[in-house]
């Protein structure tokens, strides 16, 4: 099973990805984790990424795409994987299609967690309040002003992916405002339908 989780920040992608990892035994591939692992491993592409990050610059699509390609070739991805936080742009989406096609595989489905913006801001404020109450540090991006900027960036760059995957017949939407268990159940229903359609 190879899938992409889409949705704005705070939609619950990380929570749902973790549940999918536990149930299906496939890895969650997040770009941040992959970049750190490539740098730590000292691979050729990891060295290029480190040089860019050390210079305080953003890692290019070419480097991110190479790191993703390197990662999906690892043995634990043979049964599938969950892409979380990648692709973020149409250029990256095209790169995913190419790298999978080169390997003779494809995406099973793309799941978008749909959540109302006002509810997202409320969710982030509550997450910050809960962290404070528990004596835990509050995430930098759990500040409403910072979060709203992240939302704007998401709609500008990443939201066009929904149309891209809809046109390919891969996009399925799930109500991200439902309870965590209800969202999980809906995702599992989507995955079952995708498996039966293969």
From Swiss-Prot:
Keywords: ATP-binding, Cytoplasm, Kinase, Nucleotide biosynthesis, Nucleotide-binding, Transferase
Subunit structure: Monomer.
Cell compartments where the protein resides: Cytoplasm
Gene3D superfamilies assigned to the protein according to its UniProt record, in alphabetical order: P-loop containing nucleotide triphosphate hydrolases (3.40.50.300)
GO molecular function: adenylate kinase activity; ATP binding
Pfam families referenced in this protein's UniProt entry, alphabetically: ADK (PF00406)
CDD domains in the cross-refs: ADK
Protein's pathway: Purine metabolism; AMP biosynthesis via salvage pathway; AMP from ADP: step 1/1
Membrane spanning stretches: none
Region LID, annotated ranges: 126-142
GO biological-process terms attached to the record: AMP salvage
UniProt catalytic activity: AMP + ATP = 2 ADP
Residues at which AMP binds: 31, 36, 57-59, 85-88, 92, 139, 150
Residue numbers binding ATP: 10-15, 127, 178
UniProt-recorded name of the protein: Adenylate kinase
Job description of the protein: Catalyzes the reversible transfer of the terminal phosphate group between ATP and AMP. Plays an important role in cellular energy homeostasis and in adenine nucleotide metabolism.
Entry remark concerning the domains of this protein: Consists of three domains, a large central CORE domain and two small peripheral domains, NMPbind and LID, which undergo movements during catalysis. The LID domain closes over the site of phosphoryl transfer upon ATP binding. Assembling and dissambling the active center during each catalytic cycle provides an effective means to prevent ATP hydrolysis.
Domain of life: Bacteria
Region (NMP), start-end ranges: 30-59
């Amino acid at each position: 099973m190879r899938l992409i989780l889409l949705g704005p920040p705070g939609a619950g992608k990380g929570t749902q990805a973790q549940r999918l990892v536990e149930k299906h035994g496939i890895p969650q591939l997040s770009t941040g984790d992959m970049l750190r692992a490539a740098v730590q491993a000292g691979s050729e592409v990891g060295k290029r990424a480190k040089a860019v990050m050390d210079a305080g610059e953003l890692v290019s699509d070419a480097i991110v795409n190479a790191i993703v390609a390197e990662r999906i070739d690892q043995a634990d991805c043979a049964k599938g994987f969950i892409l979380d936080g990648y692709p973020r742009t149409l250029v990256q989406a095209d790169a995913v299609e190419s790298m999978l096609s080169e390997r003779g595989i494809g995406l099973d489905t793309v799941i978008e967690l749909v959540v109302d913006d006002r509810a997202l801001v409320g969710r982030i404020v509550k997450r910050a309040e809960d962290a404070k109450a528990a004596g835990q540090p509050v995430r930098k991006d759990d500040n409403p002003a910072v979060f709203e900027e992240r939302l704007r960036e998401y709609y500008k760059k990443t939201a066009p992916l929904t149309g891209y995957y809809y046109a390919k017949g891969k996009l399925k939407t799930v109500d991200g405002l439902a309870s965590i268990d209800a969202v999980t159940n809906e995702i599992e229903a989507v995955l079952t339908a995708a498996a039966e359609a293969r």
